[in-house]
Swiss-Prot record:
Lineage: Eukaryota, Fungi, Dikarya, Ascomycota, Saccharomycotina
InterPro entries (UniProt xref): AhpC/TSA (IPR000866), Peroxiredoxin (IPR050217), Peroxiredoxin_AhpC-typ (IPR024706), Peroxiredoxin_C (IPR019479), PRX_1cys (IPR045020), Thioredoxin-like_sf (IPR036249), Thioredoxin_domain (IPR013766)
Name of the protein in question: Peroxiredoxin PRX1, mitochondrial
Species per Swiss-Prot/TrEMBL record: Saccharomyces cerevisiae (strain ATCC 204508 / S288c)
Family statement drawn from the similarity comment of this UniProt entry: Belongs to the peroxiredoxin family. Prx6 subfamily.
Top-level taxon in the UniProt lineage: Eukaryota
Catalytic activity, EC: 1.11.1.25, 1.11.1.27
Note: The active site is a conserved redox-active cysteine residue, the peroxidatic cysteine (C(P)), which makes the nucleophilic attack on the peroxide substrate. The peroxide oxidizes the C(P)-SH to cysteine sulfenic acid (C(P)-SOH), which then reacts with another cysteine residue, the resolving cysteine (C(R)), to form a disulfide bridge. The disulfide is subsequently reduced by an appropriate electron donor to complete the catalytic cycle. In this 1-Cys peroxiredoxin, no C(R) is present and C(P) instead forms a disulfide with a cysteine from another protein or with a small thiol molecule.
Length: 261
C-alpha cells in the first residue's frame, strides 16, 4: 500500500489497493496490525475515512501497555482523539478535561483513548501534570505513543502542511475526534486546528444524540440537548408516528416534533 515499506514481514504480505470500496476496511486492518519498521507515506495511499466507514483496527504502544484497538473497545462505544504535543498548554487543558469527565463517558458506555506522536515515556511524565490539574488519581484511559505516525496516517490526523513533513519526523497531529459505535463504525468526526481547544460538552452531547437516535429512530434538531424535543423522520407516516410516539407537533408535513422516551 505504501510506495516503500521496510519490513521483512511486510514483504511477505500481499499489498494491493482494493478495487472495491467494501474491501477497504480489510486492507486497512491488515496494514494497521502488521509490524512496520519504517515507511514512506504517500497521500494517494491514505485511507478515505467517512461517517459510517469501518474504523481501522491497529496495534499500538500505550500508557497501559500494548493494545489492539478493537480488543480495547470490545462492545463499547469509543472516542479516539489526538493532540498535537505533550507539555503544551491547550493539550493539557483538553486531556485534563477528558480525565475529569471520564465518569460521564463511563455512564454512556464509552471508552476513551488519546494519541500523539510522542513516545509513551513522554506521555507517562506528562500524565503527572494532568492528574495534578484535573485533580484525579488516574487519567483513566490509555494514550497512544504513535511515534511512527501509523495511526495518524490511518485516521488522517494531520493538516495539509503537516502531511508534507510526515516522513521527516517533525509531524504533529491536529486535534481530531472520532466517535466509534459498538459495531466499529465511525459515527462522527471532529477536526480542530492546533490553536483551538475542543469542547468536551459537545462530545458528550453528540454521543447522547447518537445513542438516542439509534434507540428511538428519531433525529435531533439544531442545538438539541438531552430532554429536548426530537424530530420524527419524514420517512415515518403520521399513522406510524402516532402508534410509535403518541402525541406529536406537526409544524410542516416534513417537520414533526415529539418527546423522547
Amino acid at each position: 500500500m505504501f510506495s516503500r515499506i521496510c519490513s521483512a514481514q511486510l514483504k511477505r504480505t500481499a499489498w494491493t489497493l482494493p478495487k472495491q470500496a467494501h474491501l477497504q476496511s480489510q486492507t486497512i486492518k491488515t496494514f494497521a496490525t502488521a509490524p512496520i519498521l519504517c515507511k514512506q507515506f504517500k497521500q494517494s495511499d491514505q485511507p478515505r475515512l467517512r461517517i459510517n466507514s469501518d474504523a481501522p483496527n491497529f496495534d499500538a504502544d500505550t500508557t497501559v501497555g500494548k493494545i489492539n484497538f478493537y480488543d480495547y473497545l470490545g462492545d463499547s462505544w469509543g472516542v479516539l482523539f489526538s493532540h498535537p504535543a505533550d507539555f503544551t498548554p491547550v493539550c493539557t487543558t483538553e486531556v485534563s478535561a477528558f480525565a475529569k469527565l471520564k465518569p460521564e463517558f463511563d455512564k454512556r458506555n464509552v471508552k476513551l483513548i488519546g494519541l500523539s506522536v510522542e513516545d509513551v515515556e513522554s506521555h507517562e511524565k506528562w500524565i503527572q501534570d494532568i492528574k495534578e490539574i484535573a485533580k484525579v488519581k488516574n487519567v483513566g484511559f490509555p494514550i497512544i505513543g504513535d511515534t511512527f505516525r501509523n495511526v495518524a496516517f490511518l485516521y488522517d490526523m494531520v493538516d495539509a502542511e503537516g502531511f508534507k513533513n510526515i516522513n521527516d519526523g517533525s509531524l504533529k497531529t491536529v486535534r481530531s475526534v472520532f466517535v466509534i459505535d459498538p459495531k466499529k463504525k465511525i459515527r462522527l468526526i471532529f477536526t480542530y486546528p492546533s490553536t483551538v481547544g475542543r469542547n468536551t460538552s459537545e462530545v458528550l452531547r453528540v454521543i447522547d444524540a447518537l445513542q438516542l437516535t439509534d434507540k428511538e429512530g428519531v433525529v435531533t434538531p439544531i442545538n438539541w440537548q438531552p430532554a429536548d424535543d426530537v424530530i420524527i423522520p419524514p420517512s415515518v407516516s403520521n399513522d406510524e408516528a402516532k402508534a410509535k410516539f403518541g402525541q406529536f407537533n406537526e409544524i410542516k408535513p416534513y417537520l414533526r416534533f415529539t418527546k423522547s422516551k
